[in-house]
């Protein structure tokens, strides 16, 4: 097996990160609004917020070292050069990089003031050798700061074209109502939201977008293509598409605000045994109300047991994870969190007087993360139900969004870790299913006879042990009571 040089791999990741930044249309539009004074003010605000609120803030020496390294690497990055209209020779790049090395060697950084002095020196060097605007250097010091933190912490600018950036947990978005991912030859439509412009225009999951407003996607990055699909409410969008079942076709639609349902599917899986099914795509603000409606719909249809599908669910709001867990747990700890500050430490327990006693199977996979893991661990460790599938992602940290004063945007920082009801640290560990279903990936959102997770869940859903768990969870727990581990 070939061995990858760790240093080479790290340099590749660094270049990929720089390319991602400078091919991101939202970030580029934001940077066009900056001057050096606003950029430096933003650096100070972000630095102070990291110092005060990040769970494990890095030193200014680490941040400066990362910033200078990124700046030197950026000089030879084609996306960076293109975004900043730079025409550089190999000799010019090398001279600049040597000058940055000189700045680094002379740096003695212990404070934000020291870091700002190094940033000022770097601005002079970049202006002299590259003709680079000083605000770009300041932004690289901001990115250098967040790059030294955990992978979930980041600066999130608002899109100056549309206003506050859409959050993954928001219940509506302006656009055409599709979820997409890159694919060979275009952009794959993974999901079409009900009642959105794309749904009304006849788009289907599996369609491939091959041109946008008459422009081919060849040579265009995924983020650039997605940016073109987005746009203000009331604006028109034309798409060229391919569908496996027929010839290429074109559609035109008007962008507007589209509601996003976090509960994406509610149905009876097995009418004979009255096994209900709910799929939750994220833990959003309205998920609790949507879940109530789904449960009552299934209850009125005669549901006797429930399969709750969290596969592919990346998480969302901590408060929503607690609310949903509380619907099924009559007692017991749900989750606890611990951070640097007292305000980041808490423990939440079940407190509802009326809960659903329906026997419960929860599906998870390697892409179930964060709030999904909180819910699954609460159900598992309180012996309320059975977890089926594959080991979850293991995110285990809490992020807080801090609105910024100097610019329109936010700073997302990791402020705490969360722990399971048994006080088990979830970061890096995740949830191991009670029943493991090996070597299976759900390729489509549509359930079918080949879904091994569903097959395993159906075999469990009507077992008397599951009903007993639902009943016993309301009483003092019996040590060691659980359904035996199994493999399917």
Model features per residue range: what roles?
Residues 67, 144, 148, 198-201, ...:
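Stable alpha-helical structural segments in soluble proteins, enriched in small hydrophobic residues
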Residues 369, 384-387, 393-433, 437-439:
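Acidic, polar loop-rich interaction surfaces within structured domains
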Residues 46, 141, 178, 239, ...:
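Residue-level signature of catalytic and energy-coupling elements of molecular machines
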Residues 1-153, 480-487:
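Terminal targeting/pro-maturation regions of precursor/exported proteins
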Residues 55, 60, 128-134, 155-160, ...:
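Cleft-lining beta-strand/loop regions that shape enzyme active-site pockets
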Residues 176, 188-189, 413-415:
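Short loop/turn microsegments at loop-to-beta-strand junctions
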Residues 78-94, 163-166, 337-346:
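Short, surface-exposed glycine/acidic/tryptophan-bearing loops
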């Amino acid at each position: 097996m070939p061995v990858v040089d760790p240093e080479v791999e790290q340099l590749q990741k660094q270049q990929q990160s720089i390319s991602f930044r400078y091919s991101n249309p939202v970030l580029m539009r934001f940077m066009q609004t900056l001057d050096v004074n606003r950029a430096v003010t933003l650096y100070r605000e972000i630095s102070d917020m990291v110092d005060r609120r990040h769970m494990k803030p890095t030193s200014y020496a680490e941040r400066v070292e990362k910033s200078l390294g990124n700046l030197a690497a950026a000089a030879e990055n084609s996306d960076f050069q293109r975004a900043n209209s730079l025409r550089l020779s190999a000799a010019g790049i090398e001279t600049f990089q040597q000058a940055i090395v000189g700045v680094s060697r002379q740096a003695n950084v212990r404070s934000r003031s020291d870091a700002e002095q190094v940033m000022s020196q770097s601005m002079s060097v970049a202006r002299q050798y590259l003709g680079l605007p000083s605000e770009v250097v300041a932004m690289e010091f901001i990115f250098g700061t967040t790059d030294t933190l955990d992978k979930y912490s980041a600066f999130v600018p608002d899109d100056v074209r549309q206003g506050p950036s859409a959050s993954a947990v928001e219940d509506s978005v302006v656009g055409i109502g599709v979820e997409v991912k890159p694919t060979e030859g275009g952009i794959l439509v993974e999901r079409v939201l009900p009642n959105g412009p794309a749904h009304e225009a006849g788009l289907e999951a599996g369609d491939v977008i091959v041109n946008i407003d008459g422009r081919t996607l060849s040579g265009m990055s995924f983020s650039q293509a997605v940016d073109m699909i987005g746009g203000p409410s009331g604006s028109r969008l034309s798409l060229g598409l391919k569908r496996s079942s027929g010839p290429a076709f074109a559609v035109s639609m008007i962008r507007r605000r589209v509601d996003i349902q976090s509960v994406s599917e509610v149905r009876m899986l097995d009418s004979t045994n009255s096994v209900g099914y709910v799929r939750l795509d994220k833990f959003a603000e309205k998920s609790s109300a949507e879940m109530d409606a789904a449960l009552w719909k299934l209850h009125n249809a005669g549901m006797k047991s429930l399969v709750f599908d969290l596969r592919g669910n990346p998480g969302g709001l901590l408060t929503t994870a607690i609310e949903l867990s509380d619907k099924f747990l009559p007692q017991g700890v749900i989750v606890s969190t611990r951070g640097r500050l007292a305000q980041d430490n808490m423990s939440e327990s079940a407190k509802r007087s009326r809960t659903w006693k329906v026997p419960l199977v929860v599906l998870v996979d390697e892409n179930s993360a964060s709030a999904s893991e909180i819910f699954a661990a609460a159900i598992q460790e309180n012996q309320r139900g059975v977890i089926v599938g594959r080991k979850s992602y293991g995110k285990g940290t809490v992020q807080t969004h801090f609105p910024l004063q100097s610019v329109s945007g936010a700073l997302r920082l990791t402020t705490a870790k969360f722990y399971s009801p048994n006080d088990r640290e979830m970061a890096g560990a995740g949830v191991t299913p009670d029943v493991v279903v090996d070597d299976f990936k759900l390729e489509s959102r549509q359930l079918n006879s080949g879904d091994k997770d569903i097959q395993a869940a159906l075999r469990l859903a009507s077992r008397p042990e599951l009903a007993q768990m639902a009943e016993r969870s309301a009483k003092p727990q019996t040590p060691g009571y659980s359904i035996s581990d199994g493999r399917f």
